[in-house]
Swiss-Prot record:
Signal peptide: none
Gene Ontology MF terms in the entry: endonuclease activity; RNA binding
Chain residue ranges for the region called Chaperone activity: 1-100
Function: Encapsidates the genome protecting it from nucleases. The encapsidated genomic RNA is termed the nucleocapsid (NC) and serves as template for transcription and replication. The nucleocapsid has a left-handed helical structure. As a trimer, specifically binds and acts as a chaperone to unwind the panhandle structure formed by the viral RNA (vRNA) termini. Involved in the transcription and replication initiation of vRNA by mediating primer annealing. Plays a role in cap snatching by sequestering capped RNAs in P bodies for use by the viral RdRp during transcription initiation.
Domain notes: The N-terminus is required for chaperone activity and, in trimeric form, this region likely serves in high affinity vRNA panhandle recognition. The N-terminus also contains a coiled coil region, which probably participates in but is insufficient to initiate N trimerization. The YxxL motif is indispensable for the interaction with host MAP1LC3B. The central region is involved in specific RNA-binding. Has distinct cap- and RNA-binding sites so it can bind simultaneously both the vRNA and mRNA cap.
Keywords: Capsid protein, Chaperone, Coiled coil, Endonuclease, Helical capsid protein, Host cytoplasm, Host Golgi apparatus, Hydrolase, Nuclease, Ribonucleoprotein, RNA-binding, Viral nucleoprotein, Virion
Residue window of motif YxxL: 178-181
Protein name: Nucleoprotein
Length: 433
């Protein structure tokens, strides 16, 4: 289809089909006005879809035509014998060859990449959808996230579900949930949903629904998240009653021993930290929290809530804004991101390869999480992360899934049987199971 003549013929054919389709659409609209029954409404919907599809195809062919014309101009352009492009400022040719032309027309420098998202607008948009389509989209972007992103990179995808629709003049139309799948060069607008922003906002708004359906990202599954959240209320209660190494209470003479004991607990340190967080609120995030509180969302208001750790079940790349002012929550997410880095470091260490190849397999989830969360207006308390690591670190590392589920004794027995059989039938060295 690279030939200009063929493309022009396709454009002409599609333009003719579009004229006919638009006329049929007008006839269908008139029929619905006269008799708005189901048959006429379905016909109208089909006509609208046909027109939309033809418009998309026509636009695509016109883009192809523009590209083909541009290529033809480049091919016919006389080449400079010196090998220097006409608009290059160098007087002598560079030792480097000319590379790709990077088109920056689409970039808006008023909204640079990496900016803080407009969480209020994003939250209001997501809350406007039904729970089923939100959770199904979350499943596609977390449990099956790698596959979905790979198949749709560089496009703006639409999620569709029968539970999500809107009535326009009595006609039921699908209400699509839009998510942008950026490449490394993409510039995202403040209110634009990306997979990372979507996981962040949905995990923060609907942790109870995520818990009930057990939706979990693979990167959380392999660090033993299921084990960690199994008895969360008891786990966090025991943690709060432990002695905090960072507190040295000023005790007045005659203070009861029981009160002195209480003042040394982690709970008191968390109460002090909550006072600091209460002074650092951002207006837009407060507005989002108030808006969410008036609807269906189930954001935790305390780290001891049963659904609190489920905020991180789908591995959001930062602390969700709806619970960023709940003491200990942002640090809990940081603890999970460190565990992910620890597991990846273990996996990289046990693989065969050069030091450089092993380094490539390491990750920096923690640094990314820290940077993104702090861009939302709070500083993480490293001491709380340290308390989590001291309390649960060893236990969690023992529950990592390291891709080696075979019992050592079983592996040894199987290997000895392989060695014996290979020696019977061959003089080659047996491979390791």
């Amino acid at each position: 289809m690279s030939d200009l003549t063929d493309i022009q013929e396709e454009i002409t054919r599609h333009e003719q089909q579009l004229v006919v389709a638009r006329q049929k659409l007008k006839d269908a609209e008139r029929a619905v006005e006269v008799d708005p029954d189901d048959v006429n409404k379905n016909t109208l919907q089909a006509r609208q879809q046909t027109v939309s599809a033809l418009e998309d195809k026509l636009a695509d062919y016109k883009r192809r035509m523009a590209d083909a014309v541009s290529r033809k101009k480049m091919d016919t352009k006389p080449t400079d014998p010196t090998g220097i492009e006409p608009d290059d400022h160098l007087k002598e040719r560079s030792s480097l060859r000319y590379g790709n032309v990077l088109d920056v027309n689409a970039i808006d420098i008023e909204e640079p990449s990496g900016q803080t998202a407009d969480w209020y607008t994003i939250g209001v948009y997501v809350i406007g959808f039904t729970i089923p389509i939100i959770l199904k989209a979350l499943y596609m972007l977390s449990t099956r996230g790698r596959q979905t992103v790979k198949e749709n990179k560089g496009t703006r995808i639409r999620f569709k579900d029968d539970t999500s629709f809107e009535d326009i003049n009595g006609i039921r139309r699908p209400k699509h949930l839009y998510v942008s799948m950026p490449t490394a060069q993409s510039t995202m607008k403040a209110e634009e949903l990306t997979p990372g922003r979507f996981r962040t906002i949905v995990c923060g708004l609907f942790p109870t629904q995520i818990q009930v359906r057990n939706i979990m990202s693979p990167v959380m599954g392999v660090i033993g998240f299921s084990f960690f959240v199994k008895d969360w209320p008891e786990r966090i209660r025991d943690f709060m009653e432990k002695e905090c190494p960072f507190i040295k209470p000023e005790v007045k003479p005659g203070t009861p021993a029981q009160e002195i004991e209480f003042l040394k607990r982690n709970r008191v340190y968390f109460m002090t930290r909550q006072d600091v967080l209460d002074k650092n609120h951002v207006a837009d995030i407060d507005k989002l929290i108030d808006y969410a509180a008036s609807g269906d969302p189930t954001s935790p208001d305390d780290i001891e809530s049963p659904n609190a750790p489920w905020v991180f079940a789908c591995a959001p790349d930062r602390c969700p804004p709806t619970c960023i002012y709940v003491v200990g929550m942002a640090e809990l997410g940081a603890f999970f991101s460190i565990l992910q880095d620890m597991r990846n470091t273990i996996m990289a260490s046990k693989t065969v390869g050069t030091a450089e190849e092993k380094l490539k397999k390491k990750s920096s989830f923690y640094q990314s999480y820290l940077r993104r969360t702090q861009s939302m207006g709070i500083q993480l308390d490293q001491r709380i992360i340290l308390l989590y690591m001291l309390e649960w670190g060893k236990e969690m590392v023992d529950h990592f899934h390291l891709g080696d589920d075979m019992d050592p004794e079983l592996r040894g027995l199987a290997q000895s049987l392989i060695d014996q059989k290979v020696k019977e039938i061959s003089n080659q060295e047996p491979l390791k199971i």
